[in-house]
């Protein structure tokens, strides 16, 4: 899950695209106790601090944003902390990644389960329901498909700890078990990487795929070889040449090739 979260962070730093002629609206609905406070629309900027582009009041569980957007990745920040009280970043302040486009968008969530700004293992976490943005729909679909790989890798990590690290610390010879689990883990990591590369190639015209490519070329993961990177670069050039995102991708591409 850390991988998914990281890729979400890098996406926020880097995405850009063209907008429609009309604007967007975000109609937010929160359920749960004390659903009153403030909401912010925040845009992350590459190598800079986040920028708050809009704010509004959350009243009786409802809030609204409207405007026009060119860069599609934003974050909805909901702050239900009362003035003067110690901020609670787990239960009263929430952060949701949103691929915003110029359309009518709805945001529905329960304050009891919205993902907090800071992760808390003891707290149930459930993403809000977001509708009306086709780009965000693609992002959600991708994460659902990735979940199979992530869950399997998490299980293998737990097995490695329980079946190898703990017994090994007790002086038991379990090296064969450890090697078997490690090989299985590498196999699933390769499967996950292949899925993500296939996704990038299939959706090269989408900001979601552009963000995934930037994530890997930023050094958090490593693509297989220079040929694979060059093929990916050619696909993006058709749709992104001349944009700020393309320029950043070029720089990351050059740096990554030097590392190989």
Residue ranges of model-derived segments:
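Alpha-helical solenoid scaffolds that mediate protein-protein interactions
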Residues: 199, 216, 236-240
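Sec-dependent N-terminal signal peptides
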Residues: 4-13
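A non-transmembrane, solvent-exposed segment enriched in polar/low-complexity residues
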Residues: 17-183
């Amino acid at each position: 899950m850390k991988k998914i979260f990281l890729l979400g962070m890098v996406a926020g730093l880097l995405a850009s695209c063209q907008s429609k002629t009309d604007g967007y609206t975000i109609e937010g609905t929160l359920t749960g106790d004390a659903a009153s406070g403030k909401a912010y629309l925040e845009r992350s900027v590459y190598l800079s601090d986040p920028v708050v582009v809009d704010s509004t009041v959350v009243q009786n569980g409802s809030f609204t944003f409207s405007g026009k957007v060119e860069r599609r990745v934003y974050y909805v920040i909901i702050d239900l902390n009362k003035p003067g009280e110690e901020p609670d970043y787990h239960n009263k302040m929430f952060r949701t990644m949103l691929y915003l486009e110029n359309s009518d968008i709805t945001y529905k969530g329960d304050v009891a389960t919205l993902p907090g700004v800071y992760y808390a293992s003891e707290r149930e976490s459930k993403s809000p329901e977001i509708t009306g943005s086709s780009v965000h729909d693609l992002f959600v679909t991708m994460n659902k498909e990735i979940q199979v790989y992530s869950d399997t890798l998490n299980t293998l990590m737990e097995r490695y700890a329980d079946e190898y690290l703990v017994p090994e610390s007790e002086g038991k010879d379990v090296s064969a078990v450890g090697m078997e689990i490690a090989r299985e883990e590498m196999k699933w990591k390769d499967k996950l990487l292949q899925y993500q590369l296939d996704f990038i190639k299939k959706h090269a015209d989408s900001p979601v795929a552009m963000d995934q490519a930037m994530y890997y070329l930023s050094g958090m993961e490593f693509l297989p070889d220079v040929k694979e990177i060059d093929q990916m670069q050619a696909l993006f050039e058709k749709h992104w040449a001349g944009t700020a995102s393309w320029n950043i991708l070029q720089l990351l591409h050059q740096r990554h090739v030097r590392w190989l």
